[in-house]
C-alpha cells in the first residue's frame, strides 16, 4: 500500500496532476457523501449473467470493449425491490452524449408485459468504472420514464475477486445554490431461484480458460454420445452379419448367432398388455392435466369478463337512476 501511494504521488508530480484534478472534480459531482440508501435491493444472478452476455457479445461484434445499456425489471413492495430480469436497450451518441431510444424501450416493455405481467420497470444498467457525468445524463432520461429508477453498473474489466456490481439510487442535493442530481450507493443481497442455482452452478464449474469443454454437463453429454455412437456401430455390424449369413455371403457361425439372439432377448418387450395399459394411463393423465390447465385458464378469463361486465352494468344502472331523479 505504501509503495502504491508513493507511485501515485510520483505520477502526480510528473505530469499527472491534471488527471488527478479532473478525477477529484468528477467524483464529488456525481456521488453523494454520507447518504444512506432508502430501499432494500435483492439482485438475481440472472441479471448479472444477462449483462455479462450483453457486454461479451457487443465486444465480439465491435472487436473492442464497449459500453452497453439495458433495462432492469422486477418487483417492488414498499421499500423492498427485487431485480429479477433485464433486457437490452438501443442507444445512439449525439455530440458525445448517449441518447436512449425510447420507442424501442416501449416496444420491448410491451413484449415483456405479455410474458411477465407481474414484473415492472425498475431502472437501467450499464458497464464501466465508477459513475461519471455521462451516467447522470442517461439517468435523467430514464427518470422521464419512471420516477426514482435504480442504476446498476457492472465493471467487466476489474481484476478484483469481489462481485464487480454496484447499485445506486439518485438523490437531489443543493450545490452552489443549484439543485444537482447525485448518486447514492445502495447495499444489495443476492436472491436465487432453483433454475438460477442450476445455471450458476454450471457456470461456476467452467474452467478458468473460459472453455466449456471441461464443464460437468459437457463431459456427461460427450460420454453419453460416445456410448450411443459405439452401440449404434455394434448393432449395425451385427445386423449386417445376419443379413450376410442369410444371403449366403458368409458361413453361419452358430455361436455368434446364439449371442445375437440372446442379446435381442435382453431388450425389454414393449408389446405386453401391461405396458399398453400403463402407457395409455400415462397418456390419459398427461392429457387430463393439460385439459385441466386449459379449463382453469378459460374459467379465469370468463371470471374477468363477468367482473368487467358487472362493473359496466352497475355504472349504467347508476346513470339511469341519476337521470330518473332529474326527469
UniProtKB/Swiss-Prot annotation:
Domain MPN: 41-174
Signal peptide location: none
Expression sites by tissue: Widely expressed.
Keyword Transferase set for record: no
GO BP annotation list: protein deneddylation; protein neddylation; regulation of protein neddylation
S-S bridge residues: none
Compartments, as annotated in UniProt: Nucleus; Cytoplasm; Cytoplasm, Perinuclear region
SMART domains: JAB_MPN
Cellular component per GO, a single term: COP9 signalosome
Region Interaction with Vpr: start-end pairs: 211-327
Keyword set, alphabetical order: Cytoplasm, Host-virus interaction, Nucleus, Signalosome
Domain of life: Eukaryota
Family from the record: Belongs to the peptidase M67A family. CSN6 subfamily.
Known partners and oligomeric status: Component of the CSN complex, composed of COPS1/GPS1, COPS2, COPS3, COPS4, COPS5, COPS6, COPS7 (COPS7A or COPS7B), COPS8 and COPS9 isoform 1. In the complex, it probably interacts directly with COPS2, COPS4, COPS5, COPS7 (COPS7A or COPS7B) and COPS9 isoform 1. Interacts with the translation initiation factor EIF3S6. Interacts weakly with RBX1. Directly interacts with COP1 and 14-3-3 protein sigma/SFN. Interacts with ERCC6.
Protein purpose: Component of the COP9 signalosome complex (CSN), a complex involved in various cellular and developmental processes. The CSN complex is an essential regulator of the ubiquitin (Ubl) conjugation pathway by mediating the deneddylation of the cullin subunits of SCF-type E3 ligase complexes, leading to decrease the Ubl ligase activity of SCF-type complexes such as SCF, CSA or DDB2. The complex is also involved in phosphorylation of p53/TP53, c-jun/JUN, IkappaBalpha/NFKBIA, ITPK1 and IRF8, possibly via its association with CK2 and PKD kinases.
Name of the protein this chain belongs to: COP9 signalosome complex subunit 6
Originating species: Homo sapiens
